[in-house]
């Protein structure tokens, strides 16, 4: 079985990361959560009170405190800036609400895309984000564009937040997700869009395992 690159793109809370992790584990591939990298950059900007116009200061911070990944004893992904574990802080609402603005900064995207491409050279990889199939891995053997209704995505995020002990209002989440969809698909740099050769998959009404099986079937055709 040959190793391939699998790119999974889609809007916020469409289930990309959950599905990508399972597929990577099943195939023995590396999983890279690119969204966590943009969240880490956003966390750094907020922590240091940097506005979107203070690009040089943010890039300098990212050089001083590089983003890296690790594994917990239970196999869960950990995210670090420098040697500080920021796995949980990057999932807080303040980061979620600002990440689109930071991710739209061309120099930040350029820096992180370069790092993502470097990691992808290591072999079989599953990467999820907004522009993986169009910008980061345009040569990926399998590209998936994952979507779901705003209501369903808000429900998923609501349940995730409750499980993590994060206080959340469902109606607010719906508005935030719709607003983020607009920002992500209308930004000038690497907007969210489906690659021409991507497989379109609407996950509304499907459970995680059903989505995983559909993507694995597509992957196996290419191996």
UniProtKB/Swiss-Prot annotation:
GO terms for molecular function: ATP binding; CMP kinase activity; dCMP kinase activity. It catalyses: CMP + ATP = CDP + ADP; dCMP + ATP = dCDP + ADP. Coiled coil: none annotated. One of its GO terms (biological process) is pyrimidine nucleotide metabolic process. Its EC number is 2.7.4.25. Keywords: ATP-binding, Cytoplasm, Kinase, Nucleotide-binding, Transferase. GO terms for cellular component: cytosol. Its main location: cytoplasm. The keyword Membrane does not apply. It is found in: Cytoplasm. It comes from the Bacteria. The keyword Kinase applies. It is an enzyme of class 2 (transferase). ATP binds at residues 10-18. PANTHER family: CYTIDYLATE KINASE (PTHR21299:SF2), CYTIDYLATE KINASE/PANTOATE-BETA-ALANINE LIGASE (PTHR21299). Belongs to the cytidylate kinase family. Type 1 subfamily. This is Cytidylate kinase. It comes from Streptococcus pneumoniae serotype 4 (strain ATCC BAA-334 / TIGR4).
């Amino acid at each position: 079985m040959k190793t391939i690159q699998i790119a999974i793109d889609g809007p916020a809370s469409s289930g990309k990361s959950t599905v990508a992790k399972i597929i990577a584990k099943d195939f023995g591939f590396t999983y890279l959560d690119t969204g966590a990298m943009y969240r880490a950059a956003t966390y750094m900007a907020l922590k240091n009170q940097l506005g979107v116009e203070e690009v040089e200061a943010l890039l300098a911070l990212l050089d001083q405190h590089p983003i890296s990944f690790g594994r917990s004893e239970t196999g869960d992904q950990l995210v670090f800036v420098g040697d500080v574990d920021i796995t949980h802080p990057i999932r807080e609402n303040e980061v979620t609400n600002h990440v689109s603005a930071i991710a739209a900064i061309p120099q930040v995207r350029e820096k992180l895309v370069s790092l993502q491409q470097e990691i992808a050279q290591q072999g079989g990889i599953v990467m999820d984000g907004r522009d993986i199939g169009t910008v980061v891995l345009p040569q990926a053997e399998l590209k998936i564009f994952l979507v779901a209704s705003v209501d369903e995505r808000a429900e998923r995020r609501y349940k995730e937040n409750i499980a993590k002990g994060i206080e959340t209002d469902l109606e607010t989440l719906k508005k935030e997700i719709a607003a983020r969809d607009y920002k992500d698909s209308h930004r000038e740099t690497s907007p969210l869009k489906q690659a021409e050769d991507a497989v379109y998959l609407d996950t509304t009404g499907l459970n995680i395992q059903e989505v995983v099986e559909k993507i694995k079937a597509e992957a196996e055709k290419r191996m």
